[in-house]
From Swiss-Prot:
This protein's encoding gene: hisS
Gene3D superfamilies: Anticodon-binding domain, Bira Bifunctional Protein, Domain 2
Organism: Paraburkholderia phymatum (strain DSM 17167 / CIP 108236 / LMG 21445 / STM815) (Burkholderia phymatum)
First-tier enzyme category under EC: ligase
Protein name: Histidine--tRNA ligase
CDD domains for the chain: HisRS-like_core (cd00773), HisRS_anticodon (cd00859)
Gene Ontology BP terms: histidyl-tRNA aminoacylation
Amino acid sequence: MTEQKKRLEKLSGVKGMNDILPQDAGLWEFFETTVKSMLRSYGYQNIRTPIVEHTQLFTRGIGEVTDIVEKEMYSFTDALNGENLTMRPENTAAVVRASIEHNMLYDGPKRLWYIGPMFRHERPQRGRYRQFHQVGVEALGFAGPDTDAEIILMCQRLWDDLGLTGIKLEINSLGLAEERAKHRVELIAYLEKHMDVLDEDAKRRLYTNPLRVLDTKNPALQAVAQNAPKLIDFLGDESRAHFEGLQRILKANNIPFTINPRLVRGLDYYNLTVFEWVTDKLGAQGTVAAGGRYDPLIEQLGGKPTAACGWAMGIERILELLKEENLVPENEGCDVYVAHQGEAARDQAFIVAERLRDTGLDVILHCSPDGQASSFKSQMKRADASGAAFAVILGEDEIANGTAGVKALRDSSQSNGKSEQQTVPLEDLTEYLINAMVASTEDGDD
């Protein structure tokens, strides 16, 4: 290959790390606006943590024998100082680290939320990517089932706000450490009797993380898992009361749920409540949000013993659901497109555009693609393609008369069902367009 061909070779993105193009960004913005509004309504505050953390944060926090730590982390050694670093595969551990490092809980519990990209080194498929985005909440310093219920209710409110249906809630309790220890002994003994059915993954997990065997996707193993000793039968009075308290609040708020004894989650830091919101509309990747209580984690990462719970949801999966249910909002165009011809008109066009922007209108000012003067015909084609509601037209005649042409590009009461160009004095242009935009909005609401 010649040097010239090397220079001209087309480069592509990393597989499983996707571009979000302008035609898709509107859906992302719609979701982000909706979820941020919901989070504010519950009194949650935004926290932003770095994408790169020390690897030890995740090996200690998530657990060394989890799939994420064993197989899915993007880790590297910093050539500058030899530190072992990892691109965050999830954000709960990082939020907890930040809360400890900055002594955030000195004055009481905190309700926090985050949004951003996460990274896992796995085979890309529908709903699973190497770079993916999550929004999540962490309620730090709250011990009761009421907070577990609140974060579940937040999800239900978001589904309602987005118009999503058919997302079902599954819950379980993992109890306390001593209860899990008793169950672990019984579970291992049970699974050892079925070694002939266990696949390689199950055998690998049998003595390191046997709970994860219950979460198998292997049909041959599912019958074995179905009849395995259930952790819920090992719960003591405290754990049982916590779980029953959660159920009472959910029932009081008309949130339907199913108790799934095989729901264990893939991270080691969970205890007591765990839950997932699942759908059958995304194939195998049916979980759209998941979370639970992780009371041991803050102490595990060097803080004082502190209760905590939270959830995370995959944004790409939510957007897939919105598309599946035809809930994608139309991309909104700008309000005004300013067309012009001639130097004097161009100079005035800049002034007009800035004045309109001062009022809060979204304005595109025509700029020639090739540096040459564009005909009004070609400019109006661009104006129409931009999605603008109105075009402002400035030519030699308009500049000489101190006026502007205004053309409605969409049907509205302002255009009386027609699209004739109106002549408006420049000093009245801003007020005219504001009134026209209000009228067109009211027409759209009828």
